[in-house]
Amino acid sequence: GDVYKRQHYTKVKTISFENFPNRSAGFVWGPMESMFNTALQDIYMQQTRLKQAKRGGDLQLSGEITNYDALNKGIGSDGYSSMVELRMTVRVNFVNNSNPAENMNGQQFSASREYNANQQLSAVQDELVTQMIKEIVEQIFNATVANW
């Protein structure tokens, strides 16, 4: 645990983020890009001792939001209301300059949420996108530094 942690922090002190653009082939929702980028940076700032570098960090994250769309799921478990599945996918490139074996190239992370088709997407979008972003950001964090 702690000894391993200390070794990591002696080699790895900084992290840099490139903006993840929203290149969704499906829907494009304006706020999504900044919501995602903020959430991604926040988790590293809050849960590690890494300092943010403008560029060339010991750890580097880049990528893009590749998809945001909805799928009609048909009848829900209640037997009559139909459900819509909202889906979001992010592609991530990760560079660990102190341990290149941990690098990731184009790794995909996804999340989905369902809502009732009787609801307007605009009424639930903010909350559901926030939840999906949180889930994806946690997946990315776990895939990059959680083993510390």
Each predicted region: which residue ranges?
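Short, small-residue-biased leader/transition segments that mark boundaries at the very start
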Residues: 1-4
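Surface-exposed short loop/turn segments
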Residues: 47-48, 58-104, 108-123
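Compositionally biased, intrinsically disordered linkers/stalks adjacent to structured regions
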Residues: 125-148
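N-terminal segment of the mature soluble domain
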Residues: 10-66, 98-102, 139, 144
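Extracytoplasmic/periplasmic, Sec-exported soluble proteins
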Residues: 24, 28-36, 82-86, 121-133
